[in-house]
Design a protein with these regions (language model features):
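Conserved N-terminal subdomain of the carbohydrate kinase-like
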Residues: 2-113, 117-125
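Conserved phosphate/ATP/ADP-binding segment of small-molecule kinases
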Residues: 125-166
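Charged/polar interaction segments and conserved charged motifs
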Residues: 1-2, 151
Length: 166
């Protein structure tokens, strides 16, 4: 009888880490782990809080670390079954994410991109049209995209219409 278990599925979560607030890697990591899937994290930034509800937050951009982490995983032969990306700290990080995908994603890796940038008709703090353009270029790399209504309108170049959406 063979008692070996199949290898654990692994998702790379590429997202910010907000110290306070129900968002970012603080939510993704436990949810992914609870499904029995290993969550391998590449943080894009560390914030004291998320930017939507709080003011005066601290912010550390981790752009310089993203590719280093991906290259390390590549060197040691880490298999990534899925990628989930969320908040990016800058438009330049969209290009870093594309390079990270080149490094860690196999042809059969499911890539889910959440273009986190806006809600209720407005961009989040420190985000503008440059970020939207960067996401437009990046989304061609995704198998699945998960914009909210505001993000979908911005990405499509359509006006946001407030109200109840289904």
């Amino acid at each position: 009888m063979d008692n070996t278990l199949p290898p654990l599925k692994r998702i790379a979560a590429i997202h910010d880490l907000s110290g306070l607030g129900k968002c970012s890697l603080t939510v993704a990591l436990p949810v992914i782990s609870a499904t029995g899937v290993e969550c391998a994290c590449i943080p894009t930034a560390v914030l004291s809080t998320h930017t939507g509800e709080f003011t005066g937050w601290t912010f550390r951009d981790l752009s310089d670390d993203m590719l280093s982490i991906a290259h390390h995983w590549q060197r040691i032969g880490v298999r990534i079954d899925g990628v989930y990306s969320g908040y990016l700290a800058s438009p330049e990080q969209a290009q870093l994410l594309a390079q990270t995908l080149d490094c860690i994603a196999a042809p059969d890796t499911l890539v889910v991109i959440d273009p986190v940038m806006a809600d209720n008709g407005s961009y989040y703090s420190k985000i503008d049209d440059r970020m939207c353009a960067a996401f437009r270029r990046l989304l061609s790399r995704a198998d699945v995209i998960t914009p909210n209504v505001t993000e979908a309108a911005l990405l499509a170049g359509l006006p946001y219409e407030p109200g109840t959406h289904s």
